[in-house]
């Protein structure tokens, strides 16, 4: 049984059909590359899985159970975390406050337990992600590099027991070293039971870590192939020619 599956998803915005009968799945402990040129439908697909949009027809299932995501919270409660290019972090808050943003620990009087959140944040950063240069959860997120911000967002997702990460163009603003660290983290999370969907234009980055590739064009799936059955040259041809 697949962990996450899209079943004949169609999404229209007025007269525009953004997705047409899209079907694919993500397995347990699997990294899937969602590939395609601009306008292929990748962002719409991510927004549907994230609960931002609802399908016009078709449905999403998690562990074989049909889901009806009406908001991002529904998707998160099903174990899915979307990490966008901007990571949805607040630059003016500390790492600790960002990890618990919207999920703050309070006492019986409703007061924030800042010390407890700080201690847990430090444990999260040490155990879930190795982040060079971060030695304190008190650092402002605005002072972090792009790679460090991505790592904090991933650490937050892991701490809250997400089972599927949707990584939307995660390497677009990263240095070569940060990119290698992030791709390494995706593989590490796979070993720990977290599946990932890597949405990217960069086939070389996807090819390093993905087990399978789904290529989209004009809102439809044109290829669904395992890494063992293709090459990066063949993937490039499919993206360029479709």
Where are these regions (language model features)?
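Glycine-rich phosphate-binding loops of nucleotide-dependent enzymes
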Residues: 2-242
């Amino acid at each position: 049984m697949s962990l996450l599956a899209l079943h004949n998803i169609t999404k229209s915005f007025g007269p525009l059909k953004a997705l047409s009968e899209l079907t694919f799945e993500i397995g347990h402990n699997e990294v899937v590359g969602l590939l395609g040129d601009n306008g292929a439908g990748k962002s719409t697909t991510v927004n549907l899985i994230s609960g931002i949009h609802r399908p016009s027809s078709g449905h999403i299932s998690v562990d074989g159970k049909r889901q009806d995501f009406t908001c991002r919270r529904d998707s998160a409660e099903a174990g899915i975390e979307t990490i966008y290019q901007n990571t949805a972090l607040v630059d003016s808050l500390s790492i600790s406050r960002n990890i618990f943003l919207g999920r703050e620990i309070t006492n019986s009087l409703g007061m924030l337990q800042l010390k407890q959140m700080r201690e847990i944040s430090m444990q999260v950063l040490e155990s879930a992600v190795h982040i060079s240069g971060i030695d304190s959860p008190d650092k402002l997120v605005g002072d972090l590099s792009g790679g460090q911000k991505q790592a904090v967002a991933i650490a937050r997702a892991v701490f809250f027991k997400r089972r599927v990460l949707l990584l939307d163009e995660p390497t677009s603003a990263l240095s070569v070293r940060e990119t290698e660290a992030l791709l390494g983290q995706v593989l590490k999370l796979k070993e720990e039971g977290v599946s990932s969907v890597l949405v990217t234009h960069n086939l070389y980055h996807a090819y390093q870590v993905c087990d399978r590739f789904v290529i989209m064009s004009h809102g439809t799936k044109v290829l669904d192939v395992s890494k063992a059955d293709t090459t990066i040259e063949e993937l490039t041809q499919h993206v360029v020619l479709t």
